[in-house]
Curated annotation (Swiss-Prot):
Function (record text): Binds 23S rRNA and is also seen to make contacts with the A and possibly P site tRNAs.
GO cellular component, one term: cytosolic large ribosomal subunit
Subunit architecture: Part of the 50S ribosomal subunit.
Protein name: Large ribosomal subunit protein uL16
Organism: Colwellia psychrerythraea (strain 34H / ATCC BAA-681) (Vibrio psychroerythus)
Length: 137
């Protein structure tokens, strides 16, 4: 699963997830993309589950790009531990997702297969997504 090799600090503040995505909001590498319509958090497990679903559907042909990376640690205190005594240990890693962010890209397959693969991937994700194509410049 994806997670940073090194971080300057082990734990982070929560922070707010506001605004729209400006960076990573267009299809850059492939021909087709899966774009988020809502804000939310995407865990490393969800990123991997969606990638596996797409890869299996396209039968390993074409190329898939993952455009997001889980760089935010989420901490959790153990069960039945009283409040206080510091912040809990890192449980998993997430990526903050803003509306308009391209999550995955694909090329080398037909549009019909890409749509089906992205539909399978979207069912693994906790927010609404849409299918987008690369616009000619």
């Amino acid at each position: 699963m994806l997670q940073p090799k090194r971080t300057k600090f082990r734990k982070q503040f929560k922070l707010r997830n506001r605004g729209l995505a400006h960076v990573g909001s267009s299809v850059s590498f492939g021909t087709f993309g899966l774009k988020s319509m809502e804000r939310g958090r995407m865990t490393a497990r969800q990123i991997e589950a969606a990638r596996r679903a797409m890869t299996r559907h396209v039968k390993r042909q074409g190329k898939i790009w993952i455009r997001v990376f889980p760089d935010k640690p989420i901490t959790k205190k153990p069960l039945e531990v009283r409040m206080g005594k510091g912040k809990g240990s890192v449980e998993y890693w997430v990526c903050q997702i803003l509306p308009g962010r391209v999550l995955y890209e694909m090329e080398g397959v037909s549009e019909e297969i890409a749509r089906e693969a992205f539909a399978l991937a979207a069912s693994k994700l906790p927010f609404k997504t849409t299918f987008v194509t690369r616009t000619a410049l």
